[in-house]
């Protein structure tokens, strides 16, 4: 059985070229290609049949030549603080999570780039699931499409790749997704309002830095020394802290360090001093993240006084820092929590919660 090409998997240039060739071969006017592409992203629809401005014969022809991926919404939860969490099922039954975070006049969509994650960070629910597969552009940017179709009046001001998965280990799909998110012919979100979060996958950082757009980079540091970071993040064996810091230094935009606060593990005064030194080395902004209160693998959240003292110690060393405000605590808004609950598995450990995202 022939699988039709999914128009949502192509970046804007490739999709418009493909549609243009298809239209020309059928004697259709050239403007039809942009018309169809606009209905995929700017005024999104779930099927060609909904493009009622097109002649019926053209809609039928498109449906016979291409497909449009649909994500099935299985769960939608809204927190008392306005945060919303969405669980989508894909064509093969895999589940992914998306979070919408309102904050004044800003609305941030936190999107997933993989089903599960291979990195097994000690405090992360997504890593505890294991890795299932990479997502396609249609499934990554498609999360934004789906939220736009669910609530057309709500337009995101910011996108963060801080959901399930490591985006820079799926660069083949994330790169065209960035184009779809940013290009004014598609979703048209400013590059400086799109943040890619990584544990420090060096080839991906280099590839991101090579792009001309001013996309933001956030690096999950979580420990200021190799010895401690290896115990929390096995990936540190492949990408040691010194190499990650060097890559951050070479990145031509200011980088954000993300640092989840683990009680008695990485929240002591000496850790603050070490972290401040790393941040100063590459002019990074530090975002401190209170550990989500769920989970049971030996980690406890740092106390509020400890977090405040930690932030004060970093600022005293000349480094800008912020403490992320916890959001969605009543709806399992930590990475992987909702998916784990729906699959009937016991959540082994808390993940980073999707609080207010501070990016320098």
Swiss-Prot record:
GO terms for molecular function: 4 iron, 4 sulfur cluster binding; metal ion binding; rRNA (adenine(2503)-C2-)-methyltransferase activity; rRNA binding; tRNA (adenine(37)-C2)-methyltransferase activity; tRNA binding. InterPro entries: Aldolase_TIM, Methyltransferase_A, RlmN_N, RNA_MTrfase_RlmN, rRNA_lsu_MTrfase_RlmN/Cfr, rSAM. It comes from the Bacteria. [4Fe-4S] cluster binds at residues 117, 121, 124. Gene3D superfamilies: 1.10.150.530, Aldolase class I (3.20.20.70). Binds 1 [4Fe-4S] cluster. The cluster is coordinated with 3 cysteines and an exchangeable S-adenosyl-L-methionine. S-adenosyl-L-methionine binds at residues 165-166, 197, 220-222, 292. Residues 103-330 form the Radical SAM core domain. Disulfide bonds join 110-335. Reaction proceeds by a ping-pong mechanism involving intermediate methylation of a conserved cysteine residue. This is Probable dual-specificity RNA methyltransferase RlmN. It comes from Gemmatimonas aurantiaca (strain DSM 14586 / JCM 11422 / NBRC 100505 / T-27). The lineage of its organism: Bacteria, Pseudomonadati, Gemmatimonadota, Gemmatimonadia, Gemmatimonadales. The gene is rlmN.
């Amino acid at each position: 059985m022939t699988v039709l090409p999914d128009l949502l998997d192509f970046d804007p240039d490739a999709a418009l070229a493909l549609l243009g060739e298809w239209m020309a071969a059928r004697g259709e006017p050239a403007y039809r290609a942009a018309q169809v592409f606009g209905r995929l992203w700017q005024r999104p629809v779930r099927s060609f049949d909904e493009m009622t401005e097109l002649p019926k014969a053209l809609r039928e022809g498109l449906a016979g030549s291409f497909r449009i991926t649909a994500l099935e919404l299985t769960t939608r939860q809204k927190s008392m603080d306005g945060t919303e969490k969405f669980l989508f099922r894909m064509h093969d039954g895999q589940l992914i999570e998306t979070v919408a975070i309102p904050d004044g006049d800003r609305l941030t969509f936190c999107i997933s780039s993989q089903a599960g994650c291979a990195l097994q960070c000690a405090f992360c629910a997504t890593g505890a699931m294991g890795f299932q597969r990479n997502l396609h552009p249609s499934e990554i940017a498609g999360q934004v499409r789906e939220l736009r179709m669910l609530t057309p009046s709500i337009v995101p001001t910011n996108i963060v790749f801080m959901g399930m998965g490591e985006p820079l280990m799926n660069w083949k799909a994330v790169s065209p997704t960035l184009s779809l998110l940013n290009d004014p012919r598609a979703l048209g979100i400013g590059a400086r309002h799109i943040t890619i979060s990584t544990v420090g996958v060096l080839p991906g950082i280099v590839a991101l830095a090579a792009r001309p757009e001013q996309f933001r980079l956030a690096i999950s540091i979580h420990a200021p020394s190799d010895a401690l970071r290896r115990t929390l993040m096995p990936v540190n064996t492949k990408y040691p802290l010194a190499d990650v810091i060097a890559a951050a230094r070479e990145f031509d935009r200011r980088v954000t360090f993300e640092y989840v606060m683990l009680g008695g593990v990485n929240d002591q005064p000496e850790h603050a001093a070490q972290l401040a030194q790393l941040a100063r080395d590459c002019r990074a902004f530090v975002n401190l993240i209170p550990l989500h209160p769920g989970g049971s693998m030996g980690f406890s959240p740092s106390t509020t006084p400890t977090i405040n003292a930690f932030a004060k110690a970093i600022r005293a060393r000349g480094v800008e820092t912020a403490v992320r405000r916890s959001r969605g605590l009543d709806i399992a808004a930590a990475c992987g929590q909702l998916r784990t609950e729906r699959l009937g598995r016991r959540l082994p450990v808390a993940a980073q919660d999707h609080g207010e995202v501070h990016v320098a």
